[in-house]
């Protein structure tokens, strides 16, 4: 039984509430959004918190919700209760996810990282082409995918997270800080999670590299089939097979090898920046911060990963 908002209805909620205490579910969810250093943060937190077993992102609350809460809890079966349980997964923009998390983990705390809307839009474009969700030029994809117009509405989405979890339980960080001062950024996150600070100088293997996509796939047909296989394996929690294919370079071969992505033009950047200006100003008011840097032309479009 479903509520009007897509979350579990009262009867369904009561049915699993009696066993929820026997499950181990995340206390903290890093909700992204995507393309904001989530992979980097997951790597840094490994060994300091209990993360999902075998996979970085379960995508339970947006993609695999119909599999049920026990499917999700199975990812944390290794947790003993001695460490914080955390998932890093880009749920931020999904309209159904906040209420679903609230229904199952009412005391969950949320970490978000916000990025210049122009950079984020360009990075998202490269991602959807890389995984063959779309093909074409930046302008063609922007016109064909409705979610591009609604994504980056940070203030609108943040209000929902604040309303459901309480403003004090939602940490809002900035991607610019991660890139410029990764230690300072990480300190804020670990303090919020409630674990000892992690010194990046002691983890040279981590570095400050954030995963980016430089090229389109050599074959959209091949990339689509690789993506379907990846999701098929994930739905069955066959992460060992998926990870083996990754280590063997299969995913990189399927998703890469095509033409490099051209940088945004000045006209494209200006158009996107003007489109999101009201939302940026709303975010400034909501958070009480100055985001004037997001209102100016930037010289980093070609490297936006």
List each language-model region with its residue ranges.
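Anion-recognition interface
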Residues: 2-305
